[in-house]
Amino acid sequence: MNRTRQTTDKSKNRITALYERLSRDDELAGDSNSIVNQKKMLEDYAKSNGYTDLVHFTDDGYSGGNFDRPGWKEMLWQIEDGSIGTVIVKDMSRVGRDYLQVGFYTEVFFREKGVHFVAISNGVDSDINTLSLIHISE
């Protein structure tokens, strides 16, 4: 689906954060979620949907069970700073495995900060209010 991204005033001139995470358990299970694959998927999606100023935030080898991850924390800091207008992830499980924390970030924190959120594989786009319909994959 190719569509031109209409930039809102809130996300105009702000970074598009591409967030990747892979835990050691994911890697050992042979999942096709390698960091390289996630980066390519996120870049392809962002470019085909008109997102610009792409910046990767990566946590390789970190569990989604906690949110004390360097890439995640750096991204949150830049959201607080007002530098990031959009966050794109492969799927909701890349954000984390704790349903309450994921819900807080996607439904409260990002919205309060005026950050547009997209989870590609889950069909989540906060601009069209799909967040509350999604279950995080285990």
Residue map of PLM features:
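Short, structured surface patches at the beginning of a domain
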Residues: 1-137
